[in-house]
Design a protein with these regions (language model features):
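Residue-level detector of conserved, function-critical positions
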Residues: 1-97
Length: 97
């Protein structure tokens, strides 16, 4: 489906993004690409999650066990050791104590 002028495509079991003209924005390198929220879409690569922007650039590295969509500038994230925290769209992490 088309979201923000981009469509998710799947080739050889991996996901990527194309624009409305069919031009590749992100190669099919990801296990999954979520919907865009606040200009960011979560992705999964090698079992870990991160985020790309609408230009298809990896903006937050795939280092989290799980992530949520961005809402009000923050996304909830979880680490391999089950620590939960938040990140902003620049990747700045906020961890609870």
């Amino acid at each position: 489906t088309l979201s923000n002028g981009l469509a998710r495509v799947r080739r050889n079991g991996k996901f990527g993004l194309i624009d409305i003209t069919g031009r590749e924005i992100t190669p099919c390198n990801y296990q999954f690409i979520g919907q865009f929220s606040e200009g960011m879409a979560w992705i999964e690569a090698d079992g870990l999650a991160g985020f790309i922007n609408k230009k298809g650039r990896l903006t937050i590295s795939c280092k989290y066990k799980w992530v949520s969509d961005f809402k009000n500038g923050l996304a909830l994230v979880g680490t391999q050791d089950n620590t939960k925290g938040y990140i902003n769209i620049n990747g700045l992490e906020y961890w609870g104590h």
